[in-house]
Amino acid sequence: MFLDCSSLIAENPPRPSNGIAVTDIDGDGAFELVVAGYCTANLVLKWVDGRLVDIAGPLLADPAGPALGLAAADIDGDGREELYVVNCDRATGTKDMADRLFACFGKHWLDLFAQAENAGAANHTAAGAVAAMDRWGHGRYGFLVATDGGPLRLYELTRRGRLEDGAEEAGLDSIGAARGVTALSIVSDHMDVVTVNDGGPNELFRNLGDGNFEEIAEERGIADSRPSGRAVVALDADGDGLFDLVVGTWDGAQRYFQQRMGGGFVESAGADFSMPGRIFTVVAADFDNDGYEELFFHAHGEPNRLFGWRNDQWQELELGDAAEPKGLGTGAVAADIDGDGRLELILAHGSSHGGHGSHGGGHGAEGNAQPLSVFRPEATNNGWLRVQPLTPFGAPARGAVVSLTAGGRRQRRAVCAGSGYLCQGEPVAHFGLGPLHAVEQVEVRWPDGTVVTVDNPPADRLLTVPYPPE
């Protein structure tokens, strides 16, 4: 499936890297790859003249920071995404270094947590993953931080422009050893939350529509307290219009929770799929543009794995160069870095510190330093369409759900708010069309329930869908 093209990265020395997020850092409308470095510089990799070049300034690079997870979203309604970076120098409990929340004013970046009025709100509990969350559907996001040994945190901007933790008010302040977190409309018409925990049950928080949540994992059948959960990703694998959940675990069985009509989930992974492994993160994406998303399991110290949905079940596929049997896998994302309509696979490597141990990064990280990897799928003539919904403020509408109908078949994607473990994919719904090069309809549903349909959009391009005017 994959061919190594890591030479596209202009400078790529061995380094301890963790999460990867995809966002527009410099405001030019194109996306960059932001790579978290553990006590080494964070990278902002931009596609320039056929190469990925680091454009991070000193503030974003933050070389002293033990960066793990990161996510982007527009928290202040200015039309540009802010960037949340989780720093963590402890496996659990209280940590020394605060997280960063970078905001851009003009061309000048600031860390909002470093401002006097926000210093008291900063997170000092060990944490790893972070996801964007628009709990009301207003187009202004908060950042949901998955902590270890403390409550989940939900950082939102108040009307006075201060950062406050709204998790307790929202009913999201559960305490556990949270690892992967994702947010999308999975059991309600608004953004719900799924977290996987290390050694404890998974959690599913249903959005009640008024900014409050209720935890329903056990009654819906996904609590599953046995494995040490790491990563979680949502996709509609079977095409029934309901999002299913895949959970990657560290030395436990991998899980495929299939959602049924009525809202319950059934664990239905086959023997090959569920095989235990040291899985750090999971990516769901249609790499070959055949109209069905593949699942990439990024492993630590053992070969990666790839599955495709074939004949109503998951079947293992050949990875090609991306197997990386000696790779110390950490973060991973899929993104179309060169605009050709095919998704590249970008992999980070570093220390897992025993998987847990800590969340990633880890001390003595120099011995676990490896370069980043970039892989391209083998070329096909399959059609594609990429859909980018925007908020009322013109920023990416993370958490929006996009449905596409082509050849009478309907596919669904959620625009990534946070996924896998420590990562956040591009804010675009990517659809392969197989042999087709025509689309009957695209439907976008925003987190507030607003729906727009676009009939017969041209294929093989990026379709931007603004929020409709009132």
Q: Which residues does each PLM region occupy?
A:
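Residue-level recognition of a conserved intra-blade site in WD40 beta-propeller repeats
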Residues: 22, 27, 72, 77, ...
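A generic tandem-repeat structural signature
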Residues: 63-126, 130-133, 143-144
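Gly/Ser/Thr/Pro-enriched helix-cap/hinge segments flanking short amphipathic alpha-helices
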Residues: 10-11, 314-333, 337-470
